[in-house]
Amino acid sequence: GRWRRRVGKALGSVLERRRFWERVLAGPVATQVFAGQEAHAELEIRRELKRATTVRSAGVGEVYIVGAGPGDPDLLTLKAARLLQQADVVLYDRLISEAVLDRARRDAERIYVGKEAGRHHVTQEQTQQLMIELALQGKRVCRLKGGDPFVFGRGGEELQALTAQHIPVTVVPGITAALGAAAYAGIPLTHRDHAHSVTFATGHAREGGAAPDWQELARPGQTVVFYMGLSQLPTIVAELTAAGARLDLPAAVIEHATLPEQRVIAGTLRDLAECVAAAQVRSPALLVVGEVVALRGEARAKEASRLTLPLAGENDRVKRA
């Protein structure tokens, strides 16, 4: 009763009060109350009310930049799912599945802002301006991005645009595609006998941008994951081998990672491009290069992976050197 009266006094409209209690009941306050941590809950609810009154006085909404993970809706974080339920508007990318969108509130407006190489339905600048305009209307905007928003997701640019307009922003990390793809394909990204580091690289550079450091990417004893590299696969292989990578170095392309239709095309730098072309692989797909790729084949041969890893089955195509 005490907090109900205090909230009613601080937040004048029914909508504002509803939003406040939604955040409280679905967030850490409720968890702390159930855990008997009433002092922590009291502090958290004070912070939440202060945040709500600050937003109210500014007359603006807020934006959640949310990583949706690599595809499987069960890989959404709890916080991502909670903010999806709170959002009035969801701006989503090309790689966001219907199963993930179904986690949003039923009455939330959905706006597609997808982009792909060479074909932008909406430009990045238009997306950023739309987020700003919606927030200035007092709406809660969920910017839903595949994987993690700060790993080749241009989330940093969106954060800069919003903070420049003094719009409240919450960033929610997601499982980046490399982690999800490797786990579901049974490929450890690091291994003390084979890879002491892992590098995430983009498969295509911005026009006029700096070229990748191929000597560094070809260095042995590491795993390299290329995002958005399917169309550049022959070039990537040629550059790596020219920089000293072995032709028999294991490599794999993972298509539609973590989804039921996932496929893994495995081979070596010598024959991978040919295998991928024969399998007619389509985007989205990741390229993994390193000795750890061979461990997947070992696990399958021992059938241990069937017991512990959600591997793609009939669609798998494995070619070993």
Language-model segments: residues:
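Short, solvent-exposed amphipathic alpha-helical segments in soluble enzyme
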Residues: 78-86, 104-109, 157-161, 186-188, ...
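Flexible loop/N-cap segments at domain edges
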Residues: 66-67, 71-73
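Short hydrophobic/aromatic-enriched beta-strand-loop microsegments
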Residues: 108-115, 166-170, 189-199, 244-253
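Class I SAM-dependent methyltransferase SAM-binding "motif I" and its flanking Rossmann-like core
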Residues: 148-220, 263-267
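Class I S-adenosyl-L-methionine
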Residues: 48-55, 59-65, 85-175, 180, ...
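A contiguous loop/helix-start segment that scaffolds small-molecule binding in enzyme catalytic cores
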Residues: 2-63, 126, 136-141, 197, ...
